[in-house]
A protein has these predicted regions:
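N-terminal alpha-helical scaffolding segments that mark the starts
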Residues: 1-57
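Canonical WD40 repeat/beta-propeller blade segments in eukaryotic WD-repeat proteins
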Residues: 11-20, 59-71, 107-152, 191-199, ...
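Short coil/turn segments that connect the beta-strands within blades of beta-propeller domains
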Residues: 24-26, 76-77, 157-158, 202-204, ...
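Short beta-strand elements that form the blades of beta-propeller/WD-repeat-like
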Residues: 399-406, 441, 446-447, 496-500, ...
């Protein structure tokens, strides 16, 4: 297999600035520095994490400072965000737009805190609440005046406390009936700004800090000290200094027995409440002397972030609920089990709270809240905010494949020139890098001698070097307004039509070659012509061109799908997708996040954020089939197989593969036989599946499934074997196991008369062969039956674009 690589993408993910867990604990909202918000589905294992929705940033000065979830009609609740421009916004998770905007009239908002739920308040008991004085200093402040207790009892709506820049704490009420945010009251202003705010568990008081379940107040300061206070008396109980920089975030476990702190030194520290009656167990904790009273002790810390950790939140793994399954379950054979190490799968089970951290390195990590030091954290998002890439393999214009890369506010259209002048014994891999920084790359993707054989690999660590290719030639750059970010984009198979949508409406451009320049190389030789789409089209969540490039299909934020003729620029038809739950309860339609069309132009598949699939017939312009979410999970990738326009291949967040017979409205024969018994190594596939790639051949029976960390070759023409029985106890499928370290030219490989190298076969009879990838992958596609293109970026290069973290001395330097 000939591998071509592109590493010249401008990838700079935004820092994580805020985290918030939904009311039911199954979703986590992530706010980033560029103003975007991601909704992640919480999973009970390393498999199942999925970014369901992404709300793109609005403008450069829109900086989110805090996120909260409030009770609402849905189980997850209502999502609110606070901004440094002094506004509070509620977000519509169906249209992905701002639903309500409220001005604080107090300057920048530094933090929000939501009132605890009624159930929590009923289980909380305090002493001498009636005798407590109102405190208005930096430690605590009463959340109500003496005559407001009766108002609290009669108040049904949930309240939020807002810490404002003018030194005032304001209370707002999230109204259930009017679906609005109403101002409630303000507390007396103090000197300086209010930077943090938190409710007591009984909602009787408001604190400037974090509060855990037993009423203890926890705060952090710029000296790296975590302080524990008596919330009733306002006195400091203990202070622990284990951070080498500012304490930026605090979180507590649901039972109030554990506290986590994060700081600018990249550490996440764990403190545990130990009763004075504790005997032998107290010896392992630091800071607890013999015979001591109740105390907060330092348990330990972990440093997996390279930069400041700015946000912490607690979540509960989702209890997996099986959806409607179309296939018949099959029993798996007994065999040897590989012992799992100290990884995420050992502790991430339903009912166990997990800690999630995010910071300036744009990464998200999950830790076990109850056994913080026992297991390694799990990298939730190996490639945060990856760029969207699309390739036209055989365009009508240019000399090679045309590649479109979507960034936050512009599109780059480039021509990739593929040459095949490779020498025998050299690596069949090309690295396209415009900055000439191919410096002794020691290992990349293992090579194979042919896509059809697909099982003959060589250890790439002994390869000499990469064969450097020609960098992509920039043809055009399409920019949108600075205040409007690009939501989605699409390029036709012919490569001459490009469409994108911002937060206002979709746009269409035509790429033309200017013959007057006398050259077809360079940006000056190409021209862009804007075409006017029909009026009335709103912002789009997803779009795609038909296979013959004659129609543009747009999924708008109203839940409808519009079909536009690109020649006449007329609206041909509007599909109204059928969704069972929506039709029964008259709910808004969830956003459609994926669209794909068949090669023969007959079928259109539209997939929403929850995993529901709608199939439309583009010939008669009618809905053909509705498929409820497969195995109860979201769809991560989908595509029609080129060998048959009636075959739709779908992957879900649980790492299941479904082959659907669209014409017959049923599961394909392969899925009926194998989907319920896929190999264990694929069910534990590293990273979330982000794409499918089919060989462009009508006789092909395979597909490459890839994530940001690995790729897997699946051949639907071969049986599926449970490889766990063939592995020795303790053996794992690693990078070394996928190749032979003793078979290359340096170690005396035989060179046959035909000039080709002889490789040792590995897994020659196996299906579902998994290859790990060294660098985060954004896109992978076939250019031909034996050539693939990989768009990737070394994470070390990305880290250099971030601001430098707090200096940490390395031993021995």
């Amino acid at each position: 297999m000939e591998v071509h690589r592109v590493r010249s993408i401008d990838w700079k993910p935004a820092c994580v600035v805020a985290l918030a867990t939904s009311v039911d604990g199954t979703q986590v909202a992530v706010a980033r520095e560029d103003g975007s918000i991601e909704i992640w589905k919480v999973a009970p294992g390393s498999v199942g994490w999925h970014c369901q929705l992404t709300i793109t940033g609005r403008r450069n000065d829109y900086v989110i400072s805090s996120l909260v979830w409030c009770r609402g009609s849905s189980a997850s609740g209502r999502l609110l965000s606070a901004c440094l421009d002094g506004t509070i916004s509620e977000w519509d998770l169906f249209s992905l737009q701002q639903k309500t905007v409220v001005e604080s009239f107090g300057g920048s908002i530094w933090q929000m805190a939501v009132e605890p739920l009624t159930e929590s308040r009923e289980t909380y008991s305090t002493k001498n609440n009636d005798d407590d004085d109102e405190k208005e200093n930096g430690v605590s402040a009463s959340s109500s005046e003496s005559d407001s207790d009766q108002e609290e009892d009669n108040l049904v709506e949930q309240r939020i406390a807002v810490a404002c820049d003018d030194g005032c704490v304001r209370i707002y009420v999230v109204c259930d009936s009017e679906d609005d945010i109403a101002y409630y009251k303000s507390f007396p202003r103090v000197k300086g700004r209010i930077l943090s705010v938190a409710w007591s568990i009984d909602a009787k008081r408001i604190f400037a800090g974090g509060s855990d379940g037993d009423g203890t107040l926890v705060s952090g300061d710029s000296t790296g000290t975590t302080q524990f206070w008596d919330s009733q008396q306002g006195t400091q109980l203990q202070a622990r200094t284990y951070h080498k920089g500012d304490v930026l975030a605090l979180a507590s476990t649901p039972n109030g027995q554990g506290v986590f702190s994060a700081g600018s030194d990249g550490q996440v520290a764990h403190y545990k409440f130990v009763s004075g009656t504790t005997k032998s167990s107290s010896d392992s904790f630091e800071g607890l002397a013999a015979g001591a009273r109740d105390s907060w002790v330092f348990v330990g810390s972990k440093r997996v972030h390279t930069h400041d950790v700015r946000a912490l939140t607690l979540a509960m793994p989702l209890i997996f609920e099986k959806g409607e399954f179309l296939g018949e379950p099959t029993n798996k054979e007994r065999g040897y089990r590989r012992p799992a190490g100290l990884d995420y799968r050992k502790w991430a089970i339903p009912g166990v709270p997990m800690l999630i951290s995010g910071g300036n390195d744009a990464k998200l990590f999950a830790y076990p809240a109850n056994r913080f030091l026992d297991f390694n954290p799990h990298d939730i998002c190996p490639a945060p905010q990856r760029v969207f890439v699309q390739v036209a393999r055989k365009p009508k214009i240019g000399e090679g494949p045309i590649m479109m890369i979507q960034y936050s506010s512009w599109l780059d259209v480039s021509m990739t020139k593929i040459s095949t002048d490779l020498e025998v014994g050299k690596r069949k891999s090309r690295d396209f890098d415009s900055e000439d920084n191919v410096k002794k790359q020691s290992c990349t993707l293992p090579e194979s001698v042919g896509h059809q054989s697909g099982r003959y690999f060589r250890d790439n660590r002994r390869a000499n070097s990469l064969v450097k290719g020609t960098p992509p030639t920039l043809l055009a750059t399409i920019k949108c307004k600075k205040s409007q970010h690009i939501i989605c984009s699409a390029m036709s198979e012919s490569g001459h039509l490009i469409a994108f949508s911002d937060r206002i409406k979709p746009h269409l451009y035509k790429l033309k070659f200017d013959s007057s320049t006398g050259s077809n190389v360079g940006e000056d030789s190409w021209r862009l012509k804007k075409k006017s789409l029909p009026e009335g089209l709103s912002a789009s969540h997803s779009m795609v061109f038909s296979a013959d490039s004659t129609r543009l299909i747009i999924a708008c934020n109203d839940g409808k799908i519009h079909v536009v003729d690109v020649d006449s620029l007329e609206l041909l038809h509007t599909f109204d997708p059928f969704i069972e739950d929506i039709m029964e309860h008259a709910m808004p339609r969830p956003p459609i996040t994926r669209l794909c069309t068949s090669g023969d132009g007959q079928w259109l598949a539209a997939i929403n954020c929850y995993g529901d699939v709608n199939i439309f017939n583009l010939e008669i312009l009618r809905q053909h089939w509705y498929i409820s979410r497969l195995d109860g999970c979201s769809v991560t990738a989908a595509g029609f197989h080129p060998s048959s326009g009636n075959v739709l291949v779908v992957t879900t967040s649980s790492n299941h593969v479904y082959v659907l017979d669209v014409d017959a409205k049923q599961l394909g024969e392969w899925s009926k036989r194998y989907t319920s018994g896929l190999p264990r190594r694929f069910l534990e596939f590293p990273g979330e599946v982000i794409g499918l790639s089919f060989p462009p051949s009508p006789k092909a029976t395979s597909v490459i499934v890839h994530s940001s960390k690995a790729m897997c070759l699946i051949d639907f023409g071969k049986p599926v074997n449970q490889d766990d029985n063939d592995l020795r106890n303790g053996e794992t499928i690693t990078f070394e196991k996928l190749g032979s370290a003793n078979h290359d030219l340096a170690n005396g490989d035989e060179k046959p008369s035909n000039g080709k190298l002889k490789y040792k076969p590995v897994f020659s009879d196996k299906n579902f062969v998994i290859l790990p990838l060294r660098y985060p992958v954004h896109f992978l596609t076939h250019l031909s039956e034996r050539t693939i293109l990989i768009v990737e970026k070394p994470w070390v290069d990305v880290l250099q674009k971030f601001k430098a973290p707090v200096f940490r001395h390395v031993f021995g330097t």
